[in-house]
């Protein structure tokens, strides 16, 4: 999920000059906004922008990282994803962070602001890059574990690049799905093959709740479709790994056949943030090929209670300190049983957006004020998240790496972590432990 609408809008507006320093008054986009209140707020926040631009961090592993987009089946029933992977050393350029202006229009719609705001955001943020080599050749000669990644509500495939790139730099292939369930702020497909051949995109935007809709019902339908999209993406990647000829509709420079015999088929996991965290649980309950799952600040509302007892695989909850609430934590607790591996940690001083790239593309002051940043340094937060994830993945995918050096993070043993949750559930029967043997004091 994205942050509260006004918070996100104000934060992005206030950071425009950080990305593209020009005379804002010369551009004068607020002249096109009818509401004087909006104009005044935007101008005031622009004046408050800090002078230093933040950047999305590079991966900390030993592998160079490549990036490409894959679309299989040109219709909106097909699979669309951004792939991060270990790459060969070459001179390919970095990857555009948000590659089409329509994604900014989708964000504008999600935020409930005029479409002009999408044009403004596109103008200033459209050239921001993320540190992965676009269409760089895959590093061959070994098989890689595979991660399927699910984005949050109002997000899309490209805005968790700090996680995808770091995992790829440690030797994973990461398939970041763009969901077609109506939860992405924007996505595109092609109406027919001829449209695909000439690149004539058809765009669809966030599905808004209609009057009379029950959110639980709508979100449950979406999370079921999302889980199927995760399995569908896995099917396609494994087909390519087997050597089945599958054409990338986008017809990019990246040769899909490079992926043949590149996947360690016994080492597959699913990770997701917020709505994507709920998708992790749904996917685990439906597809046993996912050996384990990591839910980042999961939003549990979309899930039926019935699935909690249908997840035998190891599951790791990594939460922020400021997003979670008792009802959400109680639902996580329903996944726990003595015979199942369950872990939970909370990153101290963190907010919901510490898991997404927005926390890196805004200045410190404004990012903090509008909850894109927490009290903890954004780089420290994502580093803890990624290292704890790597340790968990090594343990449950049987990897022969050195990620076990971070095993203590899984238990919340760091000055910036706490085991369990910071949420105080007063009924002792609702107390959530970090593991079946953990002491209750780990919760508080």
From Swiss-Prot:
Tissue spec. comment: Plasma.
Location(s), subcellular: Secreted, Extracellular space
This protein's GO CC annotations: high-density lipoprotein particle; low-density lipoprotein particle
PTMs per UniProt: N-glycosylated.
EC number per UniProt: 3.1.1.47
InterPro entries reported in the protein's UniProt record: AB_hydrolase_fold, PAF_acetylhydro_eukaryote
Predominant place of localization: secreted
A single GO molecular function term of this UniProt record: calcium-independent phospholipase A2 activity
Positions annotated as glycosylated: 60, 200, 424
Active site as annotated: 274 (nucleophile), 297 (charge relay system), 352 (charge relay system)
Protein name, as recorded: Platelet-activating factor acetylhydrolase
């Amino acid at each position: 999920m994205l942050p509260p609408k006004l918070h996100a809008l104000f934060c992005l507006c206030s950071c425009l000059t950080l990305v593209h320093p020009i005379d804002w008054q010369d551009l004068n986009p607020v002249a096109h906004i009818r509401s004087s209140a909006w104009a005044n707020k935007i101008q005031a926040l622009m004046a408050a922008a800090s002078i230093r631009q933040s950047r999305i961090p590079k991966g900390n592993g030993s592998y160079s990282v490549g990036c490409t987009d894959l679309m299989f089946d040109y219709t909106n029933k097909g699979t669309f994803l951004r792939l991060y992977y270990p790459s060969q050393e070459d001179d390919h350029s970095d990857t555009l962070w948000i590659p089409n202006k329509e994604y900014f229009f989708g964000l504008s719609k999600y935020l409930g602001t005029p479409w002009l705001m999408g044009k403004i955001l596109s103008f200033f943020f459209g050239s921001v890059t993320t540190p992965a080599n676009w269409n760089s050749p895959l590093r061959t000669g070994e098989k890689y574990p595979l991660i399927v990644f699910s984005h949050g509500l109002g997000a899309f495939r490209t805005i968790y690049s700090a996680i995808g790139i770091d995992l790829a730099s440690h030797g994973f292939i990461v398939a970041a799905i763009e969901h077609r369930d109506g939860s992405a702020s924007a996505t595109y497909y092609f109406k027919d093959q001829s449209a695909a051949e000439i690149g004539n995109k058809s765009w669809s935007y966030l599905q808004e709740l209609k009057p009379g809709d029950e959110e639980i019902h709508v979100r449950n339908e979406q999370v079921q479709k999302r889980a199927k999209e995760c399995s569908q993406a896995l099917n396609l990647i494994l087909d390519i790994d087997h050597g089945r000829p599958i054409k990338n509709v986008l017809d990019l420079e990246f040769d899909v056949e490079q992926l043949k015999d590149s996947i360690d088929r016994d080492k597959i996991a699913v990770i997701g943030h917020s709505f994507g965290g709920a998708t992790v649980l749904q996917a685990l309950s439906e597809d046993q090929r996912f050996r384990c799952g990591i839910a980042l600040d999961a939003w549990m509302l979309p899930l039926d209670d019935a699935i909690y007892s249908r997840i035998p695989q190891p599951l790791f909850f990594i939460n922020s300190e400021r997003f979670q609430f008792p009802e959400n934590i109680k639902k996580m607790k329903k996944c726990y049983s003595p015979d199942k591996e369950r872990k939970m940690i909370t990153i101290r001083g963190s907010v919901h957006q510490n898991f997404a790239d927005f926390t890196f593309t805004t200045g410190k002051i404004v990012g903090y004020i509008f909850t894109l940043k927490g009290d903890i340094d954004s780089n420290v937060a994502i580093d803890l998240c990624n290292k704890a994830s790597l340790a968990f993945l090594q343990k449950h995918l049987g990897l022969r790496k050195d990620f076990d050096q971070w095993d203590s993070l899984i238990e919340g043993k760091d000055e910036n972590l706490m085991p369990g949750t910071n949420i105080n559930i007063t009924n002792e029967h609702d107390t959530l432990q970090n593991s079946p043997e953990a002491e209750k004091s780990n919760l508080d």
